Amino acid sequence: MNERFRNILLDRDGTVIKERHYLADPNGVQLLPGAGRALRALLDAGHRLFLVTNQSGIGRGYFTLAQFAAVQQRLLQLLRQFRVEFTDTAMCPHAPQEGCQCRKPRIGLWEQLRLTHDLVPEQSIMIGDKIADIRFARRAGLAGSTLVLTGHGVNAARELGWSVADDGRSPTPPPHASDRPDQPDIVAADLAAAARWILTQPEQPPRDGL
């Protein structure tokens, strides 16, 4: 296992499960293809998994904390068939206008996990489908960040200057991407591709795109 990525922080909607607008119904939870097996492979290799999710639908009044909990239980139920469990989940329930410190890209959720589990940023990587996930990783000083092209990922990659086909294939970075602070370390088709990249990295992985 590459020690730089011992702790894997994962966005939920659009990364692990199918993106649905303000998901409040447990029946709407659907694992993205390959996600369960990818998480199992990471656990088998010794990584720890943490879910880090913004849920502003609570603060906006679109659904309740109890409904969020029901959705979470359904997710855990679906992952159980792959023998996957998260070490912990950190969730921000606030609407953007509340100005909290826990809504990504602010790093309150990282601080919560860091203090609870003695995490160090040099051994942690963030995987998500939004620019906020990449900025979160940068601000927390994490060892790496991965943008997946599921969920909002294609639009996020294009906003960052990447050339991406509508089907998410063949992402091409913008010129001098490695010098730009908001760029992910890699862009991957999905969580399964991101996991494969992590699992094959040497101790000092190069900055790359796939």
Show the residue positions of the predicted features:
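Asp-based, Mg2+/Mn2+-dependent phosphohydrolase catalytic module
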Residues: N2-R4, A66-T87, P96-M126, K130-L210
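Active-site neighborhood of HAD-like aspartate-dependent phosphohydrolases
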Residues: M1-F50
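Ser/Thr-centric signal marking residues that sit
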Residues: T15, T53, T150
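Substrate-recognition element of Asp-dependent hydrolases with the DxDx(T/V) motif
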Residues: A35, L39-Q72, E85-E98
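Active-site flanking residues adjacent to catalytic metal/cofactor-binding acidic residues
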Residues: L10-R12, T53, I127-D129
